[in-house]
């Protein structure tokens, strides 16, 4: 903290028995640093606009094109002017303590696109975009003459979270597991089990659809989907008997329903649990495959289509369940071998196979149309509209962003080593989430604790104002597009003619004046002031509401210890 000359000279007496060990930290640093980062000031007070939150917002919206691509409005930089009134004058006269925000814009107009393609460029013009409230050195804002504090918000960190319903959904008390991908901005994607062990998906908490519809929409067919989640075993047929080339490692922990033999030596007797000793014995005997009774195949799934070479008809189809009749059909045909999926009731549940059974779609196009119907009920679906909608949901950087924190959390949770990546969801990301969810259901992984502070993050002033500013700027973008399309191109257009700053000013005014998190400062005493600035709230836009917050949220979690005051826990 910087002390004035008189404060340095002031004699401070201490009547304590022990001397000070540590200097008092700057207790309101969190607020000041956050807002300075948004405006482009670093910790040393050096101003660098090109590395600020404001600059990022401008770059995410600009350049703006008109509908015919004849006009282009580019952003080249911004600067903040000097404040018109001092803090004291603002308090007395009831003004807001702010500085003018000026943006450098370059307008390019393509006059004659047909023949010469001639470009006419207006030089960079400075456009006034309204007043930007600035923070006093005490971490407060002066809005209409009153001091206000923007309280930091504690919300769920972007990333992927795995949870279960604690047995409340179904009367049997069965745990139904679910996964939720939460982006920084964009649509939420949920995967969940129902009581029949079928995996469903939801987008933005709408009605549920089979999770394989999402995989089909990404371009996978039935065979590829099964290959992603299951291993295959080859079954050979010799003299009317079935032999399987399965490693005993895969069956470890299960009880042998029949004698597992190699040549004539019994490796695992019937009714015994398969242990490491049996696995070692099989390895020393160099057992590659063993005979299985016909009943062992009942309920198993076929891995890929098997076609009769002579007639060309499909004997076995992909994901078909083997029944007693099908075993007899296989023995009657001239099949030498076929492949089955490795599933069991212990740790390799056939959840994706069951989901494919209830999936009404067969290819990518029908899957996209099914998703379109779920998102836009009542509208007639077309192939292009459905494809565009799905692309915009998770793979468009304009509509979807995990953020750097979200990507790091996501990668760590699904077991990747790299912590950086795209802000959008790739095919592999969605598959990794499903695989992790199935691993949790199979007992190889555990669910997350939602109230753990590691799964939450603090949104400070700078970030909140940045989001509000982005909303205002997107409204400006729409107005600019309309204006560009209706104006005559021959007119001498200037950037200031087509940019209207009112939407930005209005959103900022609304946030600082009426937002739940922008509060009138508690000025009863200096301590009340400091605790108000350091307070953390779970309420506010994008957070909880008082009515919906349950007991778990209000509880003191072990991770609060030494981090958050238990008396002022988020809204008690």
Where on the chain are the PLM-derived regions?
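N-terminal non-catalytic structural scaffold regions of very large proteins
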Residues: 1-533, 570
């Amino acid at each position: 903290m910087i002390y004035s000359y008189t404060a340095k000279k002031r004699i401070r007496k201490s009547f304590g028995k022990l001397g000070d060990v540590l200097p008092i930290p700057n207790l309101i640093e969190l607020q000041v640093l956050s807002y300075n980062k948004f405006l482009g000031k670093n910790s040393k007070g050096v101003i660098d606009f090109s590395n600020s939150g404001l600059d990022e917002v401008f770059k995410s919206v600009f350049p703006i094109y008109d509908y015919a691509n004849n006009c282009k409005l580019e952003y080249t930089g911004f600067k903040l002017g000097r404040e018109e009134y001092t803090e004291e004058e603002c308090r007395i006269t009831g003004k807001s303590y702010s500085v003018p925000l000026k943006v450098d814009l370059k307008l390019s107009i393509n006059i004659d696109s047909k023949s010469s393609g001639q470009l006419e460029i207006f030089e960079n013009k400075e456009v006034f975009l309204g007043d930007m409230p600035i923070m006093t050195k005490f971490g407060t804002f002066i809005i209409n003459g009153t001091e206000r504090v923007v309280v930091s918000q504690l919300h769920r960190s972007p990333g992927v979270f795995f949870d279960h319903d604690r047995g409340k959904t179904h009367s049997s008390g069965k745990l139904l597991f679910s996964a939720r991908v939460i982006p920084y901005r964009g649509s939420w994607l949920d995967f969940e089990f129902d009581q029949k062990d079928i995996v469903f998906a939801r987008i933005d908490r709408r009605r549920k659809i089979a999770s394989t519809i999402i995989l089909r929409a990404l371009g996978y067919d039935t065979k590829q989907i099964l290959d992603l989640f299951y291993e295959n075993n080859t079954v050979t047929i010799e003299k009317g008997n079935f032999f399987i080339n399965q490693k005993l490692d895969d069956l470890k922990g299960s009880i042998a329903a029949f004698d597992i033999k190699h040549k004539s030596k019994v490796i695992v007797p019937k009714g015994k649990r398969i242990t490491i000793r049996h696995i070692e014995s099989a390895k020393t005997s160099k057992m590659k495959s063993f005979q299985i009774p016909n009943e062992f195949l009942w309920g198993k799934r076929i891995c890929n289509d098997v076609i009769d070479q002579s007639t060309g008809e499909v004997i076995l189809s992909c994901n078909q369940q083997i029944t007693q009749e099908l075993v007899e059909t296989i023995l009657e045909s001239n099949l030498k071998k076929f492949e089955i999926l490795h599933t069991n009731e212990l740790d390799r549940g056939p959840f994706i196979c069951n989901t494919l059974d209830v999936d009404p779609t067969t290819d990518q196009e029908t899957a996209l149309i099914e998703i379109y119907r779920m998102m836009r009920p009542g509208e007639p679906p077309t192939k292009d509209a459905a494809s565009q909608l799905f692309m915009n949901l998770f793979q468009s950087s304009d509509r979807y962003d995990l953020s750097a924190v979200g990507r790091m959390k996501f990668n760590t949770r699904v077991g990747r080593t790299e912590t950086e990546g795209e802000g959008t969801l790739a095919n592999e990301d969605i598959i990794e989430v499903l695989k992790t969810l199935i691993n949790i259901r199979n007992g190889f992984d555990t669910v997350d604790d939602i109230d753990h502070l590691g799964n939450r993050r603090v949104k400070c002033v700078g970030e909140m104002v940045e989001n509000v500013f982005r909303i205002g700027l997107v409204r400006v973008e729409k107005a600019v597009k309309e204006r560009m399309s209706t104006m005559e191109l021959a007119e001498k257009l200037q950037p200031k003619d087509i940019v209207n700053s009112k939407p930005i000013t209005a959103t900022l005014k609304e946030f600082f004046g009426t937002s739940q998190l922008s509060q009138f400062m508690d000025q009863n005493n200096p301590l009340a002031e400091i605790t108000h600035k350091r307070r953390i709230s779970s309420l506010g836009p994008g957070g909880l509401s008082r009515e919906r917050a349950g007991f778990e949220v209000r509880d003191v979690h072990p991770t609060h210890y030494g981090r958050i005051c238990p008396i002022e826990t988020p809204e008690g």
